[in-house]
Amino acid sequence: MHIMEGFLPVEHAIGWSVASAPVVAYGLYSINKKINKNPEQRMLLGVAAAFTFVLSALKMPSVTGSCSHPTGTGLGAILFGPSAVAPIGAVVLLFQALLLAHGGLTTLGANIFSMAIVGPFAAAAVFRLARAARFPFGVGVFLAASLGDLLTYVTTACQLAFAFPDPVGGFTASLAKFAGVFALTQIPLAISEGLLTVVVMNALLRFNREELGSLNIEGNGQEVQA
């Protein structure tokens, strides 16, 4: 998902940065508001950030100019809401660009938009729909994390197709090519991420019930099943 340094045209890099900036700014406001109201949530916020950093650092080669990896943003989106994940993802992506050579500074805005905005908002929406449909809690967690991961990569494929349309088939043909190559690695990774997120949520429900009690998480103190 990390689009590499200098790969996008300048106008695309600027456009994605402009689109991402207000969401990240609102996310900072959202986090400050939540932490000021419930200071005990700092630990859970740290867990969500660490989960995102570790999973998204596990990359493997994929489409030219990008790579495949879990995103780890579903957990934070479920716990704190999608807007709070935007600044977390932005910091994670910045550190990875500077320290691990994953992604880059010129493509930071595009990577934030896909991994830290679209993915978390998709995960939160799926989780809410699953709860509204009365799916088991664990199924909702699994679907949210897995589909949030997949939609992150659909967004990256769209970004690449928009920047590099096929000479004959245009955007649609290019999107099919990018998405098809991503799917080979990303579908198994998304399933794995969904299962791992359920495991982590189980641990949080077992050891951090008090902190989770201040969040709108309906685990009822029970371990969840995928």
From Swiss-Prot:
Gene3D superfamilies xrefs: 1.10.1760.20
One Pfam family here: CbiM
Membrane topology recorded in Swiss-Prot or TrEMBL: Multi-pass membrane protein
Predominant place of localization: membrane
Annotated keywords: Cell inner membrane, Cell membrane, Cobalamin biosynthesis, Cobalt, Cobalt transport, Ion transport, Membrane, Transmembrane, Transmembrane helix, Transport
InterPro entries: CbiM, CbiM/NikMN
Spans through the membrane: 6-26, 43-63, 75-95, 107-127, 135-155, 181-201
GO cellular component, one term: ATP-binding cassette (ABC) transporter complex
Localization of this protein: Cell inner membrane
Pathway: Cofactor biosynthesis; adenosylcobalamin biosynthesis
One term of GO molecular function: cobalt ion transmembrane transporter activity
Disulfide bonds: none
GO biological process, one term: cobalamin biosynthetic process
Family membership: Belongs to the CbiM family.
PANTHER family: COBALT TRANSPORT PROTEIN CBIM, PTHR43627
NCBIfam families per record: cbiM, PRK08319.1
Assembly and oligomerization: Forms an energy-coupling factor (ECF) transporter complex composed of an ATP-binding protein (A component, CbiO), a transmembrane protein (T component, CbiQ) and 2 possible substrate-capture proteins (S components, CbiM and CbiN) of unknown stoichimetry.
Function field: Part of the energy-coupling factor (ECF) transporter complex CbiMNOQ involved in cobalt import.
HAMAP family listed in its UniProt record: CbiM
Protein name as catalogued: Cobalt transport protein CbiM 1
Organism phylogeny: Bacteria, Pseudomonadati, Thermodesulfobacteriota, Desulfuromonadia, Desulfuromonadales
